[in-house]
Amino acid sequence: MTISSKWCVCLPGSNPFGRGRLGRRQALQATGIGFVATLTSILLGAGSVAQAQPVAGSPPIVDGLSVRILADNHTDRYSVPVATPGMKIDRTGGTERPGVPPASTWRAEWGLSMFAESVLGDETKRVMIDFGYTAEALLGNMGFIGLDPATIDALVLSHGHTDHFGGLLGLLAASKGKLKPGLPLFVGGEDCFCSRQTLAGGDFGSLDRPGILAAGIKLMLAEAPAVAAGHAVVSGQIPKATKEMPLQATKEQTGLVGGLGCDPALEPASKNTGTYIPDDFQHEIATSYVVKDKGLVVLTSCSHRGVLNTIKQAQASTGVDKLHALIGGFHLVPPLSDDYVRQTVADIKALSPDYIVAAHCSGERFYDIARAEMPNRVVQANVGSRFSFGTRS
C-alpha cells in the first residue's frame, strides 16, 4: 500500500487517522516528532528528524571566524576594504573580475543569508545561516564568488519567514548530489513550520518540510542550546528576559495541510484556535561563535524576540559575556519610536560590543543613532561583504 503525506489534513480538533488506526498523539509519543514528517522521511528513505546535540560543558572556542553576507537588502559597488584592530572587512563591490562576465554581479533583495567559516586547530567548518528570499539571488551570489555547496557542514534557519527560508528549496535542488550526506538543518522547533500571514492578511508561506526531507536533509530540532558543526552554538529558543517590546511582524496558524504547516499536537493549546493569531516567534534562534581571545560573535537574523533578549540568550548558552561583535537584523523599524530605538541603542552600548554590523531589518534610524553613539564600531552590511575575527580568520 502506498501512503502519501498529501492525504493528511491535521487541523486543531480533527483526527484524520480514524478508528482502529494509530492515533496521532500515540504516534507522536512513540516517535517524538510530527507524524507527517515521520511518514515522509520513512517512505522517501531520505531525510530524518532528531533532537540537536545539546551544549555540554564549555562551548567550542574557535581560532578564527569569517562571516560572509550572501543575501541582504543592500549592495554598494564602491564599498572599500577596511582593516580595524579586531575586525577585517573585505568588500567585493565591482563586477569586472577575471573569468566573470560583466553581467554577473551581486544581487540585493529583501532577505538575509550569512555564510560562516570557522577555524579550530586544523579543522575548518562552514555553516550557512538563512537562505534569503529567492533561490535566484542566493544561487547567483554563491556562483559569483564560487561558493561550493559541497563544503557546507550545517544549515541553520533562524525563523519561519519567507525572506529567510525562501531560497532553501532552490539551493537543495541545485545542489542535488553535491551536499554532504545527512546535512543537518537546525530549526528552533515545530513552530518554525506554521503557516504565516502578513498583518494585512497576505499569504507569507510555510516551510516545506516534506521537500526538505526529500532532499536528504536531517532536521535538527534545537529548542534548547545546541552545537552546530562542532564550532557554532545555536541559541535554542529565546526567552523574553528584558523589557523590550519587539514589533508583531506576522500572524501564524497551526495545522497540517498536504504535509505543510505545523502539527497542532506539538503546539500549545493556546495556539490551536483554528485561525491566524499574533506570531510570538517562540521558535526563533540565533547562532553564536566564541572566538579565542576576542569573545562572543552573535549572528541574529531578525531579532523578533528582541535584540537584547537574543544577546542575553547567546551569552547564557555559551557562558561568555564579552560581546565582540553583533551581526544581523535587529528589527528596529517603524512604527517603533525614535525614543525606543535610542533606548535600545543605549542598552546595547552598555554591553560594550567591539563591533556591530547592521543588516537586513535593522532600520535606518538604528544605524544613524548607533553610529553617532558608537563611532568606529558600527558598520553597514552589504551583499558580499566578509567580516573576519580572530587570528586565523
List each language-model region with its residue ranges.
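N-terminal secretory signal peptides
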Residues: 1-22, 36-41
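Zn-dependent metallo-beta-lactamase
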Residues: 10, 32-45, 50-123, 234-283, ...
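Short acidic, glycine/serine/threonine-rich loops at helix termini
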Residues: 81, 196-200, 338, 370
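Pre-active-site segment of Zn-dependent metallo-hydrolases
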Residues: 102-110, 118-154, 170, 177, ...
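Divalent metal-coordination and catalytic microenvironments
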Residues: 116, 130, 142, 159, ...
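Active-site HxH/HxHxD metal-binding segment of metal-dependent hydrolases
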Residues: 153-224, 236-246, 346-354
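Cap/insert and terminal regions of metallo-dependent hydrolase folds
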Residues: 154, 161-165, 268-387
